[in-house]
């Protein structure tokens, strides 16, 4: 059993069982991957994948367990390299972060500017996506840290550290009837077609809770993962926008921002990472730059805790900022 064989079977799963795409991602050949997977299966005496002809159709029950362990082994191997780099090249490396468009566009620029000045030899890679995509990128080892804003239940098996609260706001054109409303109500908002985040109405979200509590079925006409796209379609008159208030800037003079903090419960932005992740010194610094209360000592305490309920208790005495 060799590490590259484990890397191959994990990447096949990452690429939705497409061996050709796995080969492309790993810069190797499809026949080479297929041969190594077969050699691994022969060594183990079982099949990891179910096949139909030459094509992989699914993962066997044993294969699912093997791939889960393989992922952890690859993370640990990556951790060994990180430990070595920490001692031999402490200010060199890579930091890979998965987050939403809103965080990448409106919250991270100042953090990255400060970070890059201190660590010019650390390459930063930002992966943008939905909560599910962010979770999958973290679990597959594509990224080191995840900055999450929705669906915290997806990250229950990971270290999840609270950063700050954020509120939603409503945006409309100056000519829209809601632009003249003194205090917006959920009933009034429910009368109009809505444009909001793609995952804003999946699962038990704060938006779900607000509308369900009022007995209102919202008319969602368009969804997007990008706040800038939401603003574009509001400008086109498609509907009333609901987005993070931080996404409204001084450049959006043609849009009226209406406070909705009294309509929807605030949401939490968290930083998440795997329990098995070896955090480099520059990763601790990044977290503190992003959220000043996340000093190294605080993060290390959170790392030692084995469940997120304990992590929440750790932060009970800390008043988190609201954005």
From Swiss-Prot:
GO terms for cellular component: cytoplasm. It is found in: Cytoplasm. It comes from Haemophilus influenzae (strain ATCC 51907 / DSM 11121 / KW20 / Rd). The gene is cysB. Belongs to the LysR transcriptional regulatory family. It comes from the Bacteria. Residues 1-60 form the HTH lysR-type domain. GO terms for biological process: cysteine biosynthetic process; regulation of DNA-templated transcription. Keywords: Activator, Amino-acid biosynthesis, Cysteine biosynthesis, Cytoplasm, DNA-binding, Transcription, Transcription regulation. This is HTH-type transcriptional regulator CysB. This protein is a positive regulator of gene expression for the cysteine regulon. The inducer for CysB is N-acetylserine.
